[in-house]
Amino acid sequence: MFTFDRIPLSICPQRQQHFITTNSERRAFMESLGINALIEYPFTEKLMNTDAGEFIEDIIIRKLRAKVVVVGTDYHFGKGRSGDADMLVKCGPEYGFETIVVEKEKYQDKEISSTYVREELVLGHMETVNVLMGRPYSIEGIVCPGNQFGRKIKIPTMNIYPQESKLLPPNGVYASITQIDGKEYGGVTNIGTKPTVSTDQVIGVETNLFDYEEDAYGKHIKVKLLHFIRPEMKFESIEALSKQMESDAQFSKSMLML
């Protein structure tokens, strides 16, 4: 599998771009598919300005020594996106490689693309996002200490902080499945700043797992968001928040059929 270490727009500093899947998440996903070789080629300004013909000769032929090239119908390469799938099909016989062009899948009469996924993700439409991606959208990280509020009200939680480049859904509460220690647990996850108990504006991911009672500090977890429950909100009291958290947990269990 050949890909770039960043998306082309990231070369433009004035256009900050967030990623649906980080590089580390992408590597793990590719490995799970049985792909044993992943090339993350450095995308530089020089490469961005490389002529399409030169890209074929230098990258596809000289560096990759490709015999078969598989691309999507909307694949473009080279300066100004001048190269495309048709160019590869036409040039292939001359350079000794075959080009396979894969048609895009559709969902609800709309072509599936990263743009489509982004549009649904920022709206919190997790069911649609997960269908488009072909797997649950997830956030990964190392569990770190929080403010211990969950333990005080006997609803212990795990806190992780996603990479700044990670594209997140709206702040709110979600029904979730979390992987830890090679097992999966149902739970409820809050994304946001926890305004009732904190004045910190840093966005974090806080998850309460059902039927997990071990110490998770320092462990790597993967939180899969399945259903949006409600927006994050500030409650008038700790008691009101605690009551709502219990309600959220029950709702999540019903959504997850636990």
Name each model feature, range by range.
Residues G92-G192:
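Glycine-rich, Lys/Arg-enriched anion-binding loops that position phosphate/diphosphate groups
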Residues M1, E40, V101-V102:
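A structural preference for short, hydrophobic beta-strand core positions in alpha/beta folds
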Residues P8-Y95:
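N-terminal Rossmann-like or analogous alpha/beta NTP/dinucleotide-binding catalytic cores
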Residues D5:
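Residues in the short beta-alpha loop(s) of Rossmann-like NAD(P)-binding domains
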Residues G146-L258:
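Phosphate/ribose-recognition catalytic cores of enzymes acting on nucleotide-derived substrates
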